Amino acid sequence: MTEHIMIIRHAEKPSVAEGIGGVDADGQASEGGLSVRGWQRAGALVAYFSARGTHASHIATPVVIFAAASHAKSQRPVLTVQPLAESLGVPLLSHYRSGADEAQVLTHALHTSGPVLICWRHESISMFAHLLGHPEAGEWGQDCFDAVWVFRREGEQWRWTITPQALLASDERLPRSTA
Protein backbone atom coordinates (compact mmCIF):
# COMPACT_ATOMS: atom_id res chain seq x y z
CA MET A 1 0.00 0.00 0.00
CA THR A 2 1.19 3.48 -0.78
CA GLU A 3 2.44 5.73 1.98
CA HIS A 4 2.64 8.81 -0.22
CA ILE A 5 -0.03 10.57 -2.32
CA MET A 6 0.62 13.86 -4.12
CA ILE A 7 -2.16 15.87 -5.76
CA ILE A 8 -1.85 18.72 -8.25
CA ARG A 9 -4.28 20.71 -10.30
CA HIS A 10 -3.95 20.63 -14.07
CA ALA A 11 -1.71 23.34 -15.53
CA GLU A 12 -2.86 26.77 -16.66
CA LYS A 13 -5.80 26.97 -19.01
CA PRO A 14 -6.88 29.39 -21.74
CA SER A 15 -8.74 32.55 -20.76
CA VAL A 16 -11.03 34.18 -23.29
CA ALA A 17 -11.42 37.20 -20.99
CA GLU A 18 -7.64 37.72 -20.92
CA GLY A 19 -7.14 36.85 -24.59
CA ILE A 20 -5.06 33.76 -23.76
CA GLY A 21 -5.71 30.89 -26.14
CA GLY A 22 -5.13 27.21 -25.58
CA VAL A 23 -3.19 24.71 -27.63
CA ASP A 24 -3.06 20.93 -27.81
CA ALA A 25 0.07 18.76 -27.78
CA ASP A 26 0.61 19.44 -31.49
CA GLY A 27 0.44 23.22 -31.08
CA GLN A 28 -3.00 23.48 -32.67
CA ALA A 29 -5.56 25.89 -31.22
CA SER A 30 -7.69 24.12 -28.63
CA GLU A 31 -9.86 25.68 -25.94
CA GLY A 32 -9.72 22.33 -24.11
CA GLY A 33 -5.93 22.42 -24.13
CA LEU A 34 -3.36 24.25 -22.03
CA SER A 35 -2.18 27.82 -22.36
CA VAL A 36 1.46 28.34 -23.33
CA ARG A 37 2.22 28.91 -19.63
CA GLY A 38 0.44 25.62 -18.90
CA TRP A 39 2.72 23.81 -21.33
CA GLN A 40 5.71 25.42 -19.62
CA ARG A 41 4.47 24.04 -16.30
CA ALA A 42 3.82 20.57 -17.78
CA GLY A 43 7.42 20.48 -19.00
CA ALA A 44 8.82 21.74 -15.69
CA LEU A 45 6.90 19.06 -13.78
CA VAL A 46 9.07 16.41 -15.47
CA ALA A 47 12.17 17.49 -13.56
CA TYR A 48 10.19 18.38 -10.43
CA PHE A 49 8.79 14.88 -9.94
CA SER A 50 11.76 12.95 -11.27
CA ALA A 51 14.95 11.89 -9.54
CA ARG A 52 16.65 14.66 -11.52
CA GLY A 53 14.56 17.29 -9.79
CA THR A 54 15.71 19.49 -6.94
CA HIS A 55 12.67 19.75 -4.72
CA ALA A 56 11.40 19.35 -1.20
CA SER A 57 12.17 16.02 0.44
CA HIS A 58 8.49 15.07 0.63
CA ILE A 59 8.05 15.26 -3.15
CA ALA A 60 8.73 11.84 -4.67
CA THR A 61 8.91 10.27 -8.09
CA PRO A 62 5.52 8.64 -8.75
CA VAL A 63 5.21 5.00 -9.82
CA VAL A 64 1.74 5.66 -11.25
CA ILE A 65 -0.08 8.83 -12.29
CA PHE A 66 -3.84 9.39 -12.28
CA ALA A 67 -5.40 12.17 -14.37
CA ALA A 68 -9.06 13.13 -14.56
CA ALA A 69 -10.65 11.80 -17.74
CA SER A 70 -10.73 14.09 -20.75
CA HIS A 71 -14.06 15.31 -22.03
CA ALA A 72 -15.26 17.56 -24.83
CA LYS A 73 -14.37 20.78 -22.98
CA SER A 74 -11.04 19.83 -21.39
CA GLN A 75 -8.10 17.51 -21.81
CA ARG A 76 -5.99 19.57 -19.36
CA PRO A 77 -5.33 17.01 -16.58
CA VAL A 78 -4.00 14.45 -19.07
CA LEU A 79 -2.02 17.05 -21.04
CA THR A 80 -0.42 18.31 -17.81
CA VAL A 81 1.08 14.98 -16.74
CA GLN A 82 1.49 13.13 -20.04
CA PRO A 83 5.07 14.44 -20.56
CA LEU A 84 5.96 13.30 -17.02
CA ALA A 85 4.44 9.84 -17.47
CA GLU A 86 6.23 9.40 -20.79
CA SER A 87 9.56 10.57 -19.35
CA LEU A 88 9.30 8.27 -16.33
CA GLY A 89 7.80 5.35 -18.25
CA VAL A 90 5.02 4.97 -15.67
CA PRO A 91 1.32 4.23 -16.23
CA LEU A 92 -1.01 7.20 -16.79
CA LEU A 93 -4.52 6.19 -15.74
CA SER A 94 -7.03 8.64 -17.17
CA HIS A 95 -10.37 6.89 -17.26
CA TYR A 96 -11.69 8.17 -13.91
CA ARG A 97 -14.14 11.10 -14.01
CA SER A 98 -13.71 14.27 -11.97
CA GLY A 99 -16.58 14.87 -9.57
CA ALA A 100 -17.72 11.24 -9.68
CA ASP A 101 -14.86 8.76 -9.30
CA GLU A 102 -12.63 10.20 -6.56
CA ALA A 103 -13.31 7.30 -4.16
CA GLN A 104 -12.37 4.77 -6.86
CA VAL A 105 -9.16 6.67 -7.68
CA LEU A 106 -8.21 6.72 -4.02
CA THR A 107 -8.95 3.00 -3.60
CA HIS A 108 -6.74 2.23 -6.60
CA ALA A 109 -4.02 4.61 -5.34
CA LEU A 110 -4.02 3.11 -1.84
CA HIS A 111 -3.33 -0.34 -3.30
CA THR A 112 -0.29 0.90 -5.23
CA SER A 113 3.22 0.11 -4.02
CA GLY A 114 5.07 3.41 -4.15
CA PRO A 115 4.33 7.13 -4.45
CA VAL A 116 1.25 8.20 -6.40
CA LEU A 117 0.55 11.45 -8.28
CA ILE A 118 -3.01 12.59 -8.99
CA CYS A 119 -3.70 15.45 -11.43
CA TRP A 120 -7.27 16.68 -11.13
CA ARG A 121 -9.71 19.53 -11.72
CA HIS A 122 -9.76 22.08 -8.91
CA GLU A 123 -13.47 21.75 -8.11
CA SER A 124 -13.03 18.16 -6.91
CA ILE A 125 -9.55 18.05 -5.34
CA SER A 126 -10.83 18.67 -1.81
CA MET A 127 -12.81 15.39 -2.04
CA PHE A 128 -9.49 13.50 -1.87
CA ALA A 129 -8.50 15.39 1.28
CA HIS A 130 -11.87 14.64 2.88
CA LEU A 131 -11.55 10.93 2.02
CA LEU A 132 -8.07 10.90 3.61
CA GLY A 133 -9.40 12.32 6.87
CA HIS A 134 -9.03 16.06 6.34
CA PRO A 135 -12.56 17.50 6.24
CA GLU A 136 -11.08 20.93 7.01
CA ALA A 137 -9.66 21.13 3.49
CA GLY A 138 -11.30 23.96 1.65
CA GLU A 139 -11.77 24.27 -2.06
CA TRP A 140 -8.69 24.45 -4.24
CA GLY A 141 -8.21 28.08 -5.30
CA GLN A 142 -9.62 28.92 -8.72
CA ASP A 143 -6.39 30.67 -9.76
CA CYS A 144 -3.98 28.23 -8.08
CA PHE A 145 -1.94 26.10 -10.49
CA ASP A 146 1.32 25.94 -8.53
CA ALA A 147 0.73 23.86 -5.40
CA VAL A 148 1.10 20.21 -4.43
CA TRP A 149 -1.10 18.69 -1.74
CA VAL A 150 1.08 16.02 -0.15
CA PHE A 151 -0.39 13.24 2.00
CA ARG A 152 2.00 11.00 3.98
CA ARG A 153 0.75 8.03 5.97
CA GLU A 154 1.59 8.20 9.68
CA GLY A 155 0.18 5.09 11.32
CA GLU A 156 -3.53 5.02 10.58
CA GLN A 157 -3.73 8.71 9.68
CA TRP A 158 -2.57 10.86 6.79
CA ARG A 159 -0.44 13.96 7.37
CA TRP A 160 -1.33 16.74 4.93
CA THR A 161 1.00 19.50 3.76
CA ILE A 162 0.79 22.01 0.94
CA THR A 163 4.02 22.56 -0.96
CA PRO A 164 4.68 25.25 -3.57
CA GLN A 165 5.94 23.98 -6.91
CA ALA A 166 7.98 27.20 -7.42
CA LEU A 167 8.58 26.24 -11.05
CA LEU A 168 7.68 29.40 -12.98
CA ALA A 169 8.51 33.06 -12.39
CA SER A 170 5.30 34.13 -10.63
CA ASP A 171 4.75 30.90 -8.65
CA GLU A 172 4.26 31.05 -4.90
CA ARG A 173 7.54 30.35 -3.09
CA LEU A 174 6.41 29.83 0.51
CA PRO A 175 4.58 26.76 1.85
CA ARG A 176 0.87 27.26 2.41
CA SER A 177 -0.78 26.48 5.71
CA THR A 178 -3.17 23.54 6.11
CA ALA A 179 -4.53 24.97 9.36
Question: What is the role of each PLM region?
Answer:
Residues 1-113, 124-179:
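Active-site-proximal alpha-helix that buttresses catalytic centers in soluble enzyme cores
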